[in-house]
Amino acid sequence: MMLAQKQNFMNQFYKKYHYSIQKYQITDLLFFLFLYPFSTSYGNEQFSFDSRFLPSGYNYSLNSNLPPEGEYLVDIYINKIKKESAIIPFYIKGNKLVPCLSKEKLSSLGININNNDNAECAETSKAGISNISFEFSSLRLFIAVPKNLLSEIDKISSKDIDNGIHALFFNYQVNTRLANNKNRYDYISVSPNINYFSWRLRNRFEFNQNNDKKTWERNYTYLEKSFYDKKLNLIVGESYTSSNVYNNYSFTGISVSTDTDMYTPSEIDYTPEIHGVADSDSQIIVRQGNTIIINESVPAGPFSFPITNLMYTGGQLNVEITDIYGNKKQYTVSNSSLPVMRKAGLMVYNFISGKLTKKNSEDGDFFAQGDINYGTHYNSTLFGGYQFSKNYFNLSTGIGTDLGFSGAWLLNVSRSNFKDKNGYNINLQQNTQLRPFNAGVNFDYIYRKKGYVELSGIGWHGNLYNQLKNSFSLSLSKSLDKYGNFSLDYNKIKYWDNAYDSNSMSIRYFFKFMRAMITTNYSLNKYQSYEKKDKRFSINISLPLTKDYGHISSNYSFSNANTGTATSSVGVNGSFFNDARLNWNIQQNRTTRNNGYTDNTSYIATSYASPYGVFTGSYSGSNKYSSQFYSALGGIVLHSDGVAFTQKAGDTSALVRIDNISDIKIGNTPGVYTGYNGFALIPHLQPFKKNTILINDKGIPDDIALANIKKQVIPSRGAIVKVKFDAKKGNNILFKLTTKDGKTPPLGAIAHEKNGKQINTGIVDDDGMLYMSGLSGAGIINVTWNGKVCSFPFSEKDISSKQLSVVNKQCNRPENSGD
């Protein structure tokens, strides 16, 4: 390969793969060893390794095909499924390089070792782990583990939780709307918040101005703390109730509730249990499709197997029982679920005490509320709750159960007493997923006896006028595979006084035609207060015009009602930049009424997401009116390292820092780049879950070298976790080294260049070539091997080229270094 070709190839390779580990001072090791041998006649087969991951300061001259001992960043596969990337120590045993895996590390990978092996390197073979293999060329570690040793891999301990930084941060939103250039409406929302250890103080204030009328309002103030070991969340102050039994209300008081985010899906989500009876010693095989998820031997008698999310992905299960005589029995287990249903043995609760806000209670009365969900065996969940306040009491109980092919059913009965009014509420729900038919059926029926009062109704003194009598809703959905999707929804609501009775039905069909996506909809609505039925037909067509640049799409919609009103709209919309941070939309609408009146409206809007906030503007106008709208949405974070102007922070977020380097893309959220001081805010993380913070390496400038582009955090609820990526700014150079006697340092010689606290490291190849990155200014590079050392200086002139260049250097040995 020509030198120019090699340089270009290495540039591309570097930008794609070079993420050295500066945390362990393993930066800039010579991955050039992969590439340069293509043009040499020596060492082409003896050496094949990724030298980025050699241990820091490892003084090793390569003289055999056996890789060196030390720590390597490897991809770990459990039963051929990638679980994580981690730094693992390796040592030589016999003629192999083997990993040192402690009992704690195996446990973090979801592998249970039920022995007292507390050695630094556990005896995996004695623990029952059948096979461990290391593919050095790709740095992949494969571990084959029997099913009985596997646990929930995503399980997290309290020591893994990051409570984040101490911070004072503000979210703000500013809106202005102008109508006909004279009527003005302004809205400002400010949320000053404090994070201190695991405590969260949250506030929100709003300002509204409608022409000359101005109002300030405080929405809420509350203090929150999570207790991971107890799986509960504490809130003191103004907040909203949270319940699986009752509707939600605003209140001032104290709330203690189970935080379901603290559980893994397999710990909390309902999954079926397999039950049966074996006539003799039998083999039980449970399959999902062609995959065996249970293969166990059982004695004669009843048996039961819980299905965990680790193995089960939802859907129909096939059970096969084979007795000692070879006789087989087979049956199918279908399952469905409802939101109220929980894992067998799990209890979820909410307890609240305080005062209702005046919009729910005329006098801000004291109230208390509690509810419990408990997952039982035999695929059912029991739940119930209570509410009481001044002159009011409500008691509720219910069950949700999975009846197999007929679906999941819920029955809930509540009884209320308010002053002299008594009543009850019955709710029946059903959810069936007919997976063999790619269809789903859901219905919800409510009946209320007159006199039943909800907690929100006591503010109206239990007014029985316009009380709900019954409601019924039905939803059908069917996938037609390549022919699209069909759905039908029906709703009927009836009141005791018949004042607001209504019936509605809609039929929707979605399909694709070539590149176009087409949705048709027919709806029928009947309201008690209107004699005439409202019938509407609509069609919407969306056609992508390009995906290579700008992601531009056109759209057309038409709607016609039996009232004589027809509306049509045509437009084009799109986005610019790879992360779609600049969006735009242009629409032209036309409405024709039965009296012959026609209204034409034009609309144009744009939105830009920057590192410092999201800014929006729009204009709409017709021959009779015009409207302008402007909005700014963002945040300010004050922390120990300074001030960061960011996008609006979500409930849980991450503050990323890359040493004073701007314009580096972080994650997938549009507009999230490092700002002028190297900070960027990732606004939305999942609390108590593993979140990966990823830098988009395609946007990293050539003169920036990052120690790592991916880190993982597990934040507590409401936390702002700080994630720091070490970076070096400087040029990349290939040095051609010779010693004073005309020879070259041997293959595997280690080079070091110290720049402040950073240490750049490289490895010399078999032709005396040394690759270094992140070099700036001037300095001295030391090269060591087998107790010997030589050094050479470099200057700004050597590193001035923006392209990867070759610089010849003589590496001189100090006089006292010996030969």
Swiss-Prot record:
It comes from the Bacteria. It is a multi-pass membrane protein. It is found in: Cell outer membrane. InterPro entries: Fimb_usher, FimD_plug_dom, PapC-like_C, PapC-like_C_sf, PapC_N, PapC_N_sf. One of its GO terms (molecular function) is fimbrial usher porin activity. Keywords: Cell outer membrane, Fimbrium biogenesis, Membrane, Signal, Transmembrane, Transmembrane beta strand, Transport. One of its GO terms (cellular component) is cell outer membrane. The keyword Signal applies. Pfam families: PapC_C (PF13953), PapC_N (PF13954), Usher (PF00577). GO terms for biological process: pilus assembly. Its main location: membrane. Belongs to the fimbrial export usher family. Involved in the export and assembly of C6 fimbrial subunits across the outer membrane. This is Outer membrane usher protein CssD. It comes from Escherichia coli. The lineage of its organism: Bacteria, Pseudomonadati, Pseudomonadota, Gammaproteobacteria, Enterobacterales. The gene is cssD.
